[in-house]
From Swiss-Prot:
Pfam family, one: HypA
InterPro entries: Hydgase_Ni_incorp_HypA/HybF_CS, HypA/HybF
Keyword terms: Metal-binding, Nickel, Zinc
MF terms (GO), sorted A to Z: nickel cation binding; zinc ion binding
Known role: Involved in the maturation of [NiFe] hydrogenases. Required for nickel insertion into the metal center of the hydrogenase.
Name of this chain's protein: Hydrogenase maturation factor HypA
Gene: hypA
Domain of life of the organism encoding this protein: Bacteria
Organism expressing this protein natively: Geobacter sp. (strain M21)
Biological process, per Gene Ontology: protein maturation; protein modification process
Length: 110
């Protein structure tokens, strides 16, 4: 489960930005195409934050839906995998416009 190491990194990043202040809430963006399972991050958060400035903090996850762009017809549309054909023209080789995110959006501090 790579979500454990990802969650540990999120906690470390938050501690750096908290600059010694207690964190009460973390808002994390997770893209649908990022390969990260949101439920696993939620499960790992309590264990990873124990004994840190984030202990007891609320974790709010915001899912970013996948959006692709077609190189042939330049259309943009929702995607749920990286290997879908364009629904407009059937071309492959889509570029991801959104959905690969994994980042801390907000920290609430005491």
């Amino acid at each position: 489960m790579h979500e454990m190491s990802i969650t540990q990194s999120v906690v470390e990043i938050c501690e750096v930005h908290a600059a010694g202040r207690k964190v009460t809430e973390v808002v994390l963006l997770i893209g649908e195409l990022s390969g990260v399972v949101p439920e696993s991050v939620e499960f790992c958060f309590e264990a990873c934050s124990k004994g840190t400035l984030l202990e007891g903090a609320r974790l709010q996850l915001e899912l970013v839906l996948g959006v692709g762009s077609c190189p042939a017809c330049h259309g943009e549309f929702p995607i749920s995998t990286l290997f879908e054909p364009c629904p407009g023209c059937g071309a492959f080789g889509l570029s991801v416009v959104a959905g690969e995110e994994l980042r801390v959006k907000e920290l609430e501090l005491e």
